[in-house]
Amino acid sequence: MPKMKTNRGAAKRFKLKKNAIKRGSAFKNHILTKKSHQRKANLNAPKYVHSTNVDSVKSLLCMA
């Protein structure tokens, strides 16, 4: 049986941490002038994959 291949798009978007899978934040790339300082600060906070999606993300990363 051949080796499992990691989904390269998922590998660039998710980081596996000790207790969770870290992900990026949406709405933080462009058109930032109309967004308030508070909203942009909240978008900078770390985000983690929801528990219902952890298994599917792990399978993309060949961790399951």
UniProtKB/Swiss-Prot annotation:
Keyword Cytoplasm attributed: no
Superkingdom field: Bacteria
SUPFAM superfamilies xrefs: L35p-like
A Pfam family hit: Ribosomal_L35p
GO biological process, one term: translation
GO molecular function: structural constituent of ribosome
Keyword entries, A-Z: Ribonucleoprotein, Ribosomal protein
GO terms under cellular component: cytosolic large ribosomal subunit
Protein family: Belongs to the bacterial ribosomal protein bL35 family.
PANTHER family from the UniProt entry: 54S RIBOSOMAL PROTEIN BL35M, LARGE RIBOSOMAL SUBUNIT PROTEIN BL35M
Record protein name field: Large ribosomal subunit protein bL35
Species, as recorded: Helicobacter hepaticus (strain ATCC 51449 / 3B1)
